[in-house]
């Protein structure tokens, strides 16, 4: 049986990184600072891509490595794929 893994890099992150390919409907266990939770995946997730581990409102930061890496362009539910279709940059043009 294949063991599929995810990683929460920093306790303040709101996304996990997938270390395997996952299918929608699979359940992943996550250790948070508030306790262990199980997350049902709402989308197929490719290796190396991000999974929302907390609900993220539109306009809210996407946090990975304990740092903001972008902002949600729409509401993102727990278990959803987090990628360019629902994340924008957080940089202002000069």
Where are these regions (language model features)?
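N-terminal small-residue-enriched
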Residues: 2-94
